């Protein structure tokens, strides 16, 4: 389990994404406006921590996944970070999450006039993160009623 000190020592250079056309209009709240990305508006601790969780658990796929948008995914990562940092990092912005996903190599798919976006992220890796990091607690009636994902030999990506 990572700690706050671990995240403080991470030092990924997010400034390399300034000027990226696919990030035009990205601010902390998400895609709003038309200005170029200004990395100084983002919290580096939150960016590095979110990036670490993403790299550890989420996997890219060929197609864009329209089941979960950036806003819903950022809540999952927030939950993990709140647990790992004892509540010090308990909120990350939508824009921070989007930039962290982009820095991990995920493609962005935007919808017109929406501050949220979708990514080419594996549903299986999202489910793995939800179940195995305690975001969703499953309490079956009988011990044999666990979802098949928990018994799948290929769930570890």
For the regions a language model picked out, list residue spans one by one.
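Intrinsically disordered, low-complexity serine/threonine- and proline-rich regulatory segments
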Residues: 1-52
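A diffuse structural propensity rather than consistent per-protein peaks
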Residues: 3, 64-65, 69, 90-93
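Feature of secretome-associated and extracellular-like proteins
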Residues: 3-25, 70, 79-81, 144-157
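Generic secondary-structure transition motif, activating predominantly at the C-termini of alpha-helices
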Residues: 11, 54-58, 62, 81, ...
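Positively charged, polyanion-binding regions of nucleic-acid-associated proteins
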Residues: 38-83
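Charge-enriched amphipathic alpha-helical scaffolds
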Residues: 80-111
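Phospho-regulated, low-complexity intrinsically disordered regions of nuclear gene-regulatory
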Residues: 114-157
């Amino acid at each position: 389990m990572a700690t706050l000190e671990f995240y403080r020592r991470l030092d990924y250079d997010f400034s390399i994404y300034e000027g990226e056309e696919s990030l035009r209009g990205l601010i902390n709240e998400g895609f709003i406006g038309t200005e170029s990305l200004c990395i100084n508006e983002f919290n580096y601790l939150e960016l590095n921590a979110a990036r670490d969780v993403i790299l550890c658990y989420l996997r890219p796929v060929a197609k864009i996944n329209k089941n979960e948008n950036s806003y819903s995914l950022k809540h999952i990562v927030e939950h993990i970070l709140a647990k790992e940092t004892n509540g010090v990092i308990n909120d990350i912005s939508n824009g921070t999450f989007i930039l962290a996903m982009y820095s991990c190599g995920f493609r962005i798919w935007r919808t017109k006039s929406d501050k949220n976006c979708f990514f080419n992220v594996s549903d299986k890796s999202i489910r793995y993160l939800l179940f195995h990091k305690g975001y969703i607690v499953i309490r079956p009636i009988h011990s044999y009623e666990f979802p098949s994902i928990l018994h799948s030999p290929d769930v570890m990506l």
